[in-house]
């Protein structure tokens, strides 16, 4: 058998084939090695079907059979509504003219401009990859957030939204979004909903500020009235209690005095029943004695005497006579 003689061209073809085979082998050995960063998880598919989830680290995949999708599970992501912030070099630009997202109707039929931020994190990498199309995940979160916030704003008055109900709306929106996102199986958890800015539209902002000033004045007057009430009412109550106590004391005194008079009358009457003449004489003498004690001069005159000039009046008459003589 004759062995053919290889030419240099033949040798170059053989060398190229060997190099190609070696290249395929090297690529097949090196390409299945994947590094999962500390902030990610890897979702591995085998023939397009979910197979396993990889933790951070170095992992080997079967070439041309297994593929990995890296999912940022530790990164807190956010969606902005009613405004956008974009970073250009070292500065952040703020755009807040997205009225189709921020203008809402309140429960008392007012229009309010609401800007808010939703922060969320991926907690189920498998659900995140398979349950919703990649181009629809972000829009799904935005649609749910807008529906929830619109519902909560529409149930409340504008002053409540801007004041005491603001924190309650944030907490309620977070809870409602988590319920809906869990129901559709998106694999994310909302960590916070923050109402950044809640104001009336610019066209009516001046009128609304006037209303706020009037409300503040009303509250101030109410507080002043309450302060005056708290100051005057206790004083009036004290004066009233004092008058009541004085009246009760006077009433008790009169009642006790009346009871004493009744007891005295009863005792006198009992004596009178026993000896009417003696009792009558005694009462007469006691009454006469009480009267005479208050009189300086006492004159006893017999009622049968006529043209009687008492010695007491002689001194007065003599003084008048002497005075008349001197005048003459």
Swiss-Prot record:
It is found in: Membrane. It is a single-pass membrane protein. SUPFAM superfamilies: Band 7/SPFH domain. The chain crosses the membrane at residues 13-33. Keywords: Membrane, Transmembrane, Transmembrane helix. GO terms for cellular component: membrane. Its main location: membrane. CDD domains: SPFH_HflK (cd03404). HflC and HflK could encode or regulate a protease. Belongs to the band 7/mec-2 family. HflK subfamily. HflC and HflK may interact to form a multimeric complex. This is Protein HflK. It comes from Treponema pallidum (strain Nichols). The gene is hflK.
């Amino acid at each position: 058998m004759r062995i053919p003689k290889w030419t240099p061209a033949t040798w170059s073809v053989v060398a190229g084939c060997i190099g190609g085979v070696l290249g395929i082998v090297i690529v097949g050995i090196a390409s299945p090695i994947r590094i999962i960063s500390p902030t990610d998880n890897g979702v591995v598919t085998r023939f397009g079907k979910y197979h396993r989830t990889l933790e951070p680290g170095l992992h080997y995949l079967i070439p041309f059979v297994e593929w990995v999708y890296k999912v940022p599970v530790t990164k807190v992501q956010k969606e902005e509504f009613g405004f956008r912030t974009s970073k250009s070099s070292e500065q952040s630009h703020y755009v807040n003219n997205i009225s189709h997202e921020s203008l809402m109707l309140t429960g008392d039929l007012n229009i309010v401009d609401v800007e808010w931020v939703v922060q969320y994190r991926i907690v189920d990498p498998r659900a995140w990859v398979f349950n919703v199309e990649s181009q629809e995940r972000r829009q799904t979160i935005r649609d749910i957030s807008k529906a929830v916030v619109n519902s909560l704003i529409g149930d409340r008055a504008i002053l409540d939204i801007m004041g005491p109900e603001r924190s309650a709306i944030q907490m309620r929106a977070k809870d409602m979004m988590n319920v809906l996102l869990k129901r559709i199986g998106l694999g994310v958890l909302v960590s916070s909903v923050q109402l950044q800015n809640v104001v009336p539209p610019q066209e009516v902002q001046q009128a609304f500020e006037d209303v706020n000033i009037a409300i503040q004045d009303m509250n101030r007057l109410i507080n002043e009235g309450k302060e005056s009430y708290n100051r005057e009412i206790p004083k009036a109550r004290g004066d009233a209690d004092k008058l009541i106590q004085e009246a009760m004391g006077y009433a008790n005194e009169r009642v006790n005095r009346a009871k004493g008079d009744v007891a005295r009358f009863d005792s006198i009457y009992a004596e009178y029943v026993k000896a009417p003449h003696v009792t009558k004489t005694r009462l007469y003498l006691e009454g006469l004695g009480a009267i005479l004690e208050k009189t300086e001069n006492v004159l006893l005159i017999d009622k049968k005497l006529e043209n009687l000039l008492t010695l007491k009046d002689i001194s007065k008459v003599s003084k008048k006579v002497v005075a008349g003589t001197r005048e003459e």
